[in-house]
Swiss-Prot record:
MF term (GO), any: structural constituent of ribosome
Record flagged with keyword Ribosomal protein: yes
Keyword NAD: no
Lineage: Bacteria, Pseudomonadati, Pseudomonadota, Gammaproteobacteria, Pseudomonadales
Organism per entry: Pseudomonas aeruginosa (strain ATCC 15692 / DSM 22644 / CIP 104116 / JCM 14847 / LMG 12228 / 1C / PRS 101 / PAO1)
Family recorded in the similarity comment: Belongs to the bacterial ribosomal protein bL27 family.
GO biological process: translation
Matches recorded under Pfam families: Ribosomal_L27
Domain of life of the native organism: Bacteria
Keywords, in A-Z order: Ribonucleoprotein, Ribosomal protein
Name of the protein in question: Large ribosomal subunit protein bL27
GO cellular component: cytosolic large ribosomal subunit
InterPro entries: Ribosomal_bL27, Ribosomal_bL27_CS
């Protein structure tokens, strides 16, 4: 009898596509207005001087300059700012 019994079915075998989040331009790097600095879920990083916040919490440069990361305030919030080159 050359028959093979049916194998079981698995409930695994799927995964979501990665969202490519994270810091895109690091401290000390030169940027132009419109460049994306950080892609994030929620405000892990807050917008400082010269930085805008998109509706999906993406941080982007509003002016030309150099990226600066800093921690400020009583809660230790991380801010991303643009300083003049």
């Amino acid at each position: 009898m050359a028959h093979k019994k049916a194998g079981g079915s698995t409930r695994n075998g799927r995964d979501s596509e990665s969202k490519r989040l994270g810091v895109k331009l690091f401290g000390g790097q030169a940027v132009k207005a419109g460049n994306i600095l950080v892609r994030q879920r929620g405000t892990k990083f807050h917008a400082g001087y010269g930085v805008g916040l998109g509706k999906d919490h993406t941080l982007f440069a509003k002016v030309d300059g150099v990226v600066k990361f800093e921690t400020k305030g009583a809660f230790g919030r991380k801010y991303v700012s643009i300083v003049a080159a």
